Amino acid sequence: LPPLDEAYLEETLLQLLAIPSPVGLTDAVVRYVAGRLDGLGIPYVITRRGAIRATLRGQERHPARAIVAHLDTLGAMVRELKDNGRVGVVPIGTWSSRFAEGGRLTLFTDTQQIRGTCLPLKTSGHAFGDAIDTQPSSWDHVEVRLDHPLASEADLQAAGVRVGDWMAFDPQPELQPGGYINARYLDDKAAVAVLLTACKALRDSGAELPVDAHPLFTITEEVGSGSSAALHGDIAEMVSLDIAIAAPGQATDERAVTICLQDQSGPFDYHLSHKLIGLAQSFGIEHRRDVFRFYRSDSAAAVEAGNDIRTALIGFGADASHAQERTHLDSLRALGRLSVAYLMSAPVARRDSRNLPNSASVAVSRLRTLGCPGRTVSEHPQYSRNLPFGGS
Protein backbone atom coordinates (compact mmCIF):
# COMPACT_ATOMS: atom_id res chain seq x y z
CA LEU A 1 0.00 0.00 0.00
CA PRO A 2 1.17 3.60 -0.55
CA PRO A 3 2.67 4.95 2.70
CA LEU A 4 0.84 7.50 4.83
CA ASP A 5 2.48 10.87 5.50
CA GLU A 6 2.24 10.82 9.29
CA ALA A 7 3.60 14.35 9.71
CA TYR A 8 0.81 15.55 7.41
CA LEU A 9 -1.71 13.54 9.43
CA GLU A 10 -0.68 15.07 12.76
CA GLU A 11 -0.44 18.59 11.36
CA THR A 12 -3.86 18.33 9.71
CA LEU A 13 -5.47 16.96 12.87
CA LEU A 14 -4.12 19.76 15.06
CA GLN A 15 -5.18 22.41 12.55
CA LEU A 16 -8.67 20.92 12.28
CA LEU A 17 -9.05 20.84 16.05
CA ALA A 18 -8.08 24.52 16.22
CA ILE A 19 -11.06 25.50 14.04
CA PRO A 20 -14.38 25.70 15.93
CA SER A 21 -17.06 23.81 13.99
CA PRO A 22 -20.17 22.99 16.02
CA VAL A 23 -23.10 21.99 13.82
CA GLY A 24 -24.36 25.09 12.03
CA LEU A 25 -21.08 27.00 12.33
CA THR A 26 -18.94 25.08 9.88
CA ASP A 27 -17.97 27.59 7.16
CA ALA A 28 -14.41 28.01 8.46
CA VAL A 29 -13.63 24.30 8.59
CA VAL A 30 -15.20 23.77 5.16
CA ARG A 31 -12.88 26.45 3.77
CA TYR A 32 -9.92 24.77 5.46
CA VAL A 33 -10.66 21.33 3.99
CA ALA A 34 -11.32 22.88 0.58
CA GLY A 35 -7.87 24.45 0.80
CA ARG A 36 -6.33 21.10 1.68
CA LEU A 37 -8.01 19.52 -1.35
CA ASP A 38 -6.77 22.37 -3.53
CA GLY A 39 -3.26 21.67 -2.29
CA LEU A 40 -3.60 18.02 -3.31
CA GLY A 41 -5.03 18.91 -6.72
CA ILE A 42 -8.29 17.09 -5.97
CA PRO A 43 -11.40 18.65 -7.56
CA TYR A 44 -14.50 19.13 -5.44
CA VAL A 45 -17.86 20.86 -5.24
CA ILE A 46 -19.53 22.41 -2.21
CA THR A 47 -23.24 21.67 -1.87
CA ARG A 48 -25.86 24.28 -1.04
CA ARG A 49 -25.84 23.10 2.56
CA GLY A 50 -22.05 23.29 2.72
CA ALA A 51 -20.88 19.68 2.48
CA ILE A 52 -17.86 18.88 0.29
CA ARG A 53 -17.96 16.25 -2.45
CA ALA A 54 -14.51 15.58 -3.89
CA THR A 55 -13.64 13.31 -6.81
CA LEU A 56 -10.79 10.84 -7.31
CA ARG A 57 -11.11 9.59 -10.87
CA GLY A 58 -10.86 5.87 -11.48
CA GLN A 59 -10.44 3.71 -14.54
CA GLU A 60 -14.23 3.43 -14.75
CA ARG A 61 -17.01 5.83 -13.79
CA HIS A 62 -19.36 3.17 -12.37
CA PRO A 63 -20.12 1.73 -9.91
CA ALA A 64 -18.87 4.81 -8.06
CA ARG A 65 -18.10 4.72 -4.35
CA ALA A 66 -17.96 7.25 -1.53
CA ILE A 67 -15.91 7.46 1.64
CA VAL A 68 -17.21 9.94 4.18
CA ALA A 69 -16.15 11.74 7.36
CA HIS A 70 -17.91 14.62 9.10
CA LEU A 71 -16.54 18.09 9.84
CA ASP A 72 -19.17 19.13 12.38
CA THR A 73 -18.78 18.67 16.12
CA LEU A 74 -20.82 18.91 19.25
CA GLY A 75 -21.31 22.34 20.78
CA ALA A 76 -23.85 24.49 22.57
CA MET A 77 -26.16 27.45 22.03
CA VAL A 78 -27.50 30.26 24.21
CA ARG A 79 -31.07 29.51 25.27
CA GLU A 80 -31.53 32.17 27.97
CA LEU A 81 -30.14 35.54 29.04
CA LYS A 82 -30.14 35.42 32.84
CA ASP A 83 -30.66 38.17 35.40
CA ASN A 84 -27.23 37.47 36.91
CA GLY A 85 -25.43 38.28 33.65
CA ARG A 86 -24.82 34.66 32.74
CA VAL A 87 -26.41 32.59 29.98
CA GLY A 88 -28.40 29.38 29.98
CA VAL A 89 -27.27 26.64 27.63
CA VAL A 90 -28.77 24.06 25.29
CA PRO A 91 -26.54 21.39 23.72
CA ILE A 92 -25.92 21.02 20.01
CA GLY A 93 -25.85 17.30 19.38
CA THR A 94 -26.12 14.62 22.04
CA TRP A 95 -23.68 14.89 24.92
CA SER A 96 -23.73 15.12 28.69
CA SER A 97 -23.44 18.38 30.61
CA ARG A 98 -20.97 16.53 32.88
CA PHE A 99 -18.34 17.05 30.20
CA ALA A 100 -19.26 20.69 29.65
CA GLU A 101 -18.75 21.60 33.31
CA GLY A 102 -15.50 23.48 33.71
CA GLY A 103 -14.97 23.72 29.97
CA ARG A 104 -13.52 26.87 28.47
CA LEU A 105 -15.35 28.09 25.38
CA THR A 106 -15.90 30.82 22.84
CA LEU A 107 -19.31 32.43 22.37
CA PHE A 108 -19.98 33.83 18.90
CA THR A 109 -22.24 36.89 18.83
CA ASP A 110 -23.26 38.54 15.57
CA THR A 111 -20.32 40.94 15.83
CA GLN A 112 -17.68 39.53 18.18
CA GLN A 113 -16.32 36.52 20.04
CA ILE A 114 -16.40 36.37 23.85
CA ARG A 115 -14.49 33.85 25.93
CA GLY A 116 -16.16 32.11 28.84
CA THR A 117 -16.49 29.06 31.09
CA CYS A 118 -19.35 26.60 31.53
CA LEU A 119 -20.07 26.09 35.25
CA PRO A 120 -22.61 24.33 37.47
CA LEU A 121 -25.13 26.67 39.11
CA LYS A 122 -23.38 26.04 42.43
CA THR A 123 -19.63 26.01 41.97
CA SER A 124 -17.72 27.34 44.96
CA GLY A 125 -17.37 24.94 47.87
CA HIS A 126 -16.57 27.93 50.08
CA ALA A 127 -20.01 29.36 49.34
CA PHE A 128 -22.21 26.27 49.01
CA GLY A 129 -20.42 23.52 50.95
CA ASP A 130 -21.66 20.00 50.25
CA ALA A 131 -24.44 21.35 48.03
CA ILE A 132 -22.03 21.44 45.11
CA ASP A 133 -21.83 17.62 45.28
CA THR A 134 -25.56 16.99 45.62
CA GLN A 135 -26.87 19.29 42.88
CA PRO A 136 -28.24 17.53 39.78
CA SER A 137 -26.14 17.14 36.66
CA SER A 138 -28.04 18.32 33.58
CA TRP A 139 -28.08 21.13 31.04
CA ASP A 140 -30.68 22.87 33.20
CA HIS A 141 -28.10 23.05 35.99
CA VAL A 142 -25.21 24.70 34.16
CA GLU A 143 -24.64 28.24 32.94
CA VAL A 144 -21.92 30.11 31.09
CA ARG A 145 -19.88 32.82 32.79
CA LEU A 146 -18.54 35.18 30.14
CA ASP A 147 -15.26 37.05 30.51
CA HIS A 148 -16.89 40.45 30.15
CA PRO A 149 -18.28 42.92 32.72
CA LEU A 150 -21.80 41.50 32.90
CA ALA A 151 -24.15 41.59 35.89
CA SER A 152 -27.65 41.59 34.35
CA GLU A 153 -29.72 40.67 31.33
CA ALA A 154 -29.43 44.28 30.18
CA ASP A 155 -25.64 44.01 30.25
CA LEU A 156 -25.83 40.90 28.08
CA GLN A 157 -28.08 42.70 25.61
CA ALA A 158 -25.70 45.67 25.51
CA ALA A 159 -22.77 43.33 24.81
CA GLY A 160 -24.63 41.88 21.82
CA VAL A 161 -25.31 38.48 23.39
CA ARG A 162 -28.53 36.95 22.05
CA VAL A 163 -30.51 33.75 22.36
CA GLY A 164 -29.30 31.45 19.60
CA ASP A 165 -25.64 32.48 19.73
CA TRP A 166 -23.28 29.55 19.13
CA MET A 167 -20.71 28.31 21.62
CA ALA A 168 -17.67 26.16 20.83
CA PHE A 169 -15.77 24.43 23.63
CA ASP A 170 -11.97 24.37 23.56
CA PRO A 171 -10.65 21.05 22.18
CA GLN A 172 -7.56 21.00 24.44
CA PRO A 173 -5.52 18.69 22.17
CA GLU A 174 -2.53 16.85 23.53
CA LEU A 175 -0.29 14.51 21.53
CA GLN A 176 1.84 12.29 23.74
CA PRO A 177 5.29 11.00 22.68
CA GLY A 178 3.96 7.45 23.07
CA GLY A 179 1.27 8.06 20.44
CA TYR A 180 -1.79 8.77 22.55
CA ILE A 181 -3.95 11.70 21.44
CA ASN A 182 -6.35 13.42 23.83
CA ALA A 183 -8.87 16.05 22.74
CA ARG A 184 -12.48 16.98 22.46
CA TYR A 185 -13.86 16.46 18.96
CA LEU A 186 -11.62 13.66 17.78
CA ASP A 187 -15.09 12.66 16.64
CA ASP A 188 -14.77 13.19 13.80
CA LYS A 189 -11.77 15.41 13.09
CA ALA A 190 -9.40 12.50 13.54
CA ALA A 191 -11.20 10.66 10.74
CA VAL A 192 -11.21 13.80 8.57
CA ALA A 193 -7.43 14.06 8.99
CA VAL A 194 -7.10 10.36 8.15
CA LEU A 195 -9.23 10.71 5.02
CA LEU A 196 -7.22 13.68 3.77
CA THR A 197 -4.00 11.77 4.48
CA ALA A 198 -5.31 8.75 2.58
CA CYS A 199 -6.12 11.02 -0.38
CA LYS A 200 -2.59 12.44 -0.21
CA ALA A 201 -1.08 8.95 -0.20
CA LEU A 202 -3.01 8.05 -3.34
CA ARG A 203 -2.05 11.29 -5.11
CA ASP A 204 1.62 11.10 -4.12
CA SER A 205 1.94 7.51 -5.28
CA GLY A 206 0.05 7.97 -8.54
CA ALA A 207 -2.02 4.91 -7.70
CA GLU A 208 -4.78 4.08 -10.17
CA LEU A 209 -8.22 3.49 -8.72
CA PRO A 210 -10.52 0.93 -10.35
CA VAL A 211 -13.62 3.17 -10.15
CA ASP A 212 -14.45 6.76 -9.31
CA ALA A 213 -14.26 7.51 -5.60
CA HIS A 214 -15.84 10.48 -3.88
CA PRO A 215 -14.43 11.62 -0.54
CA LEU A 216 -17.34 13.33 1.22
CA PHE A 217 -17.06 15.76 4.11
CA THR A 218 -20.43 16.33 5.75
CA ILE A 219 -21.47 19.03 8.22
CA THR A 220 -24.56 17.81 10.10
CA GLU A 221 -23.76 14.26 11.21
CA GLU A 222 -24.04 15.07 14.92
CA VAL A 223 -27.71 16.04 14.49
CA GLY A 224 -28.60 13.10 12.26
CA SER A 225 -28.85 14.38 8.68
CA GLY A 226 -25.18 14.13 7.65
CA SER A 227 -24.74 12.62 4.21
CA SER A 228 -28.44 12.66 3.32
CA ALA A 229 -28.02 15.53 0.83
CA ALA A 230 -24.46 14.83 -0.37
CA LEU A 231 -25.19 11.84 -2.63
CA HIS A 232 -26.34 12.27 -6.23
CA GLY A 233 -27.72 8.84 -7.04
CA ASP A 234 -24.51 7.64 -8.68
CA ILE A 235 -22.97 6.09 -5.55
CA ALA A 236 -23.25 2.31 -5.25
CA GLU A 237 -21.33 1.83 -1.98
CA MET A 238 -20.32 4.12 0.85
CA VAL A 239 -17.95 3.63 3.77
CA SER A 240 -18.25 5.97 6.76
CA LEU A 241 -15.14 6.86 8.77
CA ASP A 242 -16.06 7.73 12.34
CA ILE A 243 -15.25 7.20 15.99
CA ALA A 244 -15.33 3.61 17.30
CA ILE A 245 -16.30 3.05 20.90
CA ALA A 246 -13.73 1.59 23.29
CA ALA A 247 -15.59 0.76 26.51
CA PRO A 248 -16.42 -2.20 28.77
CA GLY A 249 -18.42 -4.72 26.78
CA GLN A 250 -17.06 -3.49 23.44
CA ALA A 251 -14.43 -5.19 21.27
CA THR A 252 -12.92 -1.92 19.97
CA ASP A 253 -9.27 -1.20 20.79
CA GLU A 254 -7.64 2.24 20.84
CA ARG A 255 -4.71 0.92 18.80
CA ALA A 256 -6.63 -0.79 15.98
CA VAL A 257 -9.23 0.02 13.35
CA THR A 258 -12.76 -1.16 14.06
CA ILE A 259 -15.08 -2.62 11.43
CA CYS A 260 -18.59 -2.17 12.78
CA LEU A 261 -21.12 -4.78 11.70
CA GLN A 262 -24.20 -3.13 13.24
CA ASP A 263 -25.28 0.06 14.99
CA GLN A 264 -28.67 1.19 16.30
CA SER A 265 -29.97 1.57 12.73
CA GLY A 266 -29.35 -2.12 12.03
CA PRO A 267 -26.72 -4.26 10.28
CA PHE A 268 -24.44 -2.78 7.64
CA ASP A 269 -24.11 -4.38 4.21
CA TYR A 270 -22.79 -7.92 4.65
CA HIS A 271 -20.68 -8.01 1.50
CA LEU A 272 -19.10 -4.57 1.87
CA SER A 273 -18.34 -5.13 5.56
CA HIS A 274 -16.74 -8.50 4.89
CA LYS A 275 -14.77 -7.07 2.00
CA LEU A 276 -13.26 -4.60 4.49
CA ILE A 277 -12.51 -7.42 6.92
CA GLY A 278 -10.80 -9.33 4.11
CA LEU A 279 -8.71 -6.30 3.14
CA ALA A 280 -7.60 -5.82 6.74
CA GLN A 281 -6.57 -9.47 6.94
CA SER A 282 -4.78 -9.41 3.57
CA PHE A 283 -2.70 -6.33 4.39
CA GLY A 284 -1.99 -7.24 8.02
CA ILE A 285 -3.95 -4.28 9.39
CA GLU A 286 -4.71 -4.58 13.10
CA HIS A 287 -8.49 -4.59 13.34
CA ARG A 288 -11.45 -5.48 15.51
CA ARG A 289 -15.07 -6.34 14.75
CA ASP A 290 -17.71 -4.67 16.89
CA VAL A 291 -21.36 -3.66 17.20
CA PHE A 292 -22.62 -0.40 18.70
CA ARG A 293 -26.02 -0.25 20.38
CA PHE A 294 -26.34 3.50 20.93
CA TYR A 295 -24.75 4.86 17.78
CA ARG A 296 -25.54 6.15 14.32
CA SER A 297 -23.45 7.60 11.51
CA ASP A 298 -23.57 9.14 8.05
CA SER A 299 -24.45 5.69 6.70
CA ALA A 300 -27.82 5.74 8.43
CA ALA A 301 -28.57 9.24 7.13
CA ALA A 302 -27.78 8.15 3.57
CA VAL A 303 -30.06 5.11 3.68
CA GLU A 304 -32.89 6.94 5.45
CA ALA A 305 -32.78 9.59 2.71
CA GLY A 306 -33.76 6.89 0.22
CA ASN A 307 -30.39 6.12 -1.36
CA ASP A 308 -30.08 2.60 -2.77
CA ILE A 309 -26.50 1.98 -1.65
CA ARG A 310 -24.40 -0.49 0.27
CA THR A 311 -23.02 1.00 3.47
CA ALA A 312 -20.31 0.10 5.96
CA LEU A 313 -18.66 1.74 8.96
CA ILE A 314 -15.00 1.70 9.98
CA GLY A 315 -13.53 3.77 12.77
CA PHE A 316 -10.60 4.73 14.93
CA GLY A 317 -10.79 3.27 18.43
CA ALA A 318 -11.40 5.92 21.08
CA ASP A 319 -12.13 6.02 24.78
CA ALA A 320 -14.74 8.39 26.28
CA SER A 321 -16.66 9.29 23.12
CA HIS A 322 -18.49 12.64 23.21
CA ALA A 323 -16.45 13.54 26.28
CA GLN A 324 -12.68 13.88 26.79
CA GLU A 325 -11.81 11.56 23.94
CA ARG A 326 -8.59 9.60 23.55
CA THR A 327 -7.21 7.57 20.68
CA HIS A 328 -3.77 6.42 19.52
CA LEU A 329 -1.78 7.08 16.37
CA ASP A 330 -1.71 3.32 15.75
CA SER A 331 -5.49 3.40 15.31
CA LEU A 332 -5.32 6.35 12.92
CA ARG A 333 -2.62 4.58 10.91
CA ALA A 334 -4.74 1.44 10.71
CA LEU A 335 -7.81 3.42 9.64
CA GLY A 336 -5.77 5.22 7.00
CA ARG A 337 -4.27 2.03 5.59
CA LEU A 338 -7.66 0.32 5.42
CA SER A 339 -9.13 3.40 3.69
CA VAL A 340 -6.37 3.33 1.07
CA ALA A 341 -6.77 -0.42 0.57
CA TYR A 342 -10.51 0.00 0.10
CA LEU A 343 -10.18 2.83 -2.43
CA MET A 344 -7.68 0.77 -4.45
CA SER A 345 -9.82 -2.38 -4.42
CA ALA A 346 -12.40 -3.56 -6.93
CA PRO A 347 -16.09 -2.81 -6.35
CA VAL A 348 -18.06 -5.24 -4.23
CA ALA A 349 -20.42 -6.10 -7.09
CA ARG A 350 -20.20 -5.18 -10.76
CA ARG A 351 -23.97 -5.48 -11.04
CA ASP A 352 -24.23 -2.39 -8.80
CA SER A 353 -23.38 -0.27 -11.86
CA ARG A 354 -26.71 -1.13 -13.49
CA ASN A 355 -29.44 1.48 -13.43
CA LEU A 356 -32.31 0.05 -11.42
CA PRO A 357 -35.94 1.18 -11.72
CA ASN A 358 -36.87 3.83 -9.22
CA SER A 359 -38.84 2.92 -6.13
CA ALA A 360 -42.10 4.33 -7.48
CA SER A 361 -42.06 2.12 -10.60
CA VAL A 362 -41.18 -0.95 -8.52
CA ALA A 363 -44.07 -0.21 -6.17
CA VAL A 364 -46.52 0.10 -9.08
CA SER A 365 -45.24 -3.14 -10.60
CA ARG A 366 -45.64 -4.92 -7.26
CA LEU A 367 -49.20 -3.67 -6.83
CA ARG A 368 -50.14 -4.80 -10.33
CA THR A 369 -48.66 -8.22 -9.65
CA LEU A 370 -50.58 -8.61 -6.42
CA GLY A 371 -53.78 -7.61 -8.22
CA CYS A 372 -53.55 -10.31 -10.91
CA PRO A 373 -56.03 -13.15 -10.21
CA GLY A 374 -54.48 -16.58 -9.92
CA ARG A 375 -50.90 -15.29 -9.89
CA THR A 376 -48.76 -15.00 -6.79
CA VAL A 377 -45.78 -12.79 -6.22
CA SER A 378 -43.47 -15.81 -6.21
CA GLU A 379 -44.72 -16.78 -9.69
CA HIS A 380 -43.96 -13.39 -11.21
CA PRO A 381 -40.73 -13.30 -13.26
CA GLN A 382 -39.50 -10.25 -11.38
CA TYR A 383 -39.40 -12.24 -8.14
CA SER A 384 -38.69 -15.78 -9.34
CA ARG A 385 -35.32 -15.27 -11.03
CA ASN A 386 -32.21 -16.41 -9.15
CA LEU A 387 -30.15 -13.45 -8.01
CA PRO A 388 -26.37 -13.78 -7.59
CA PHE A 389 -25.16 -14.13 -4.04
CA GLY A 390 -22.19 -12.16 -2.81
CA GLY A 391 -20.10 -9.90 -4.96
CA SER A 392 -20.75 -11.61 -8.32
Which residues does each PLM region occupy?
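N-terminal hydrophobic/helix-forming segments and targeting peptides
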Residues: 1-392
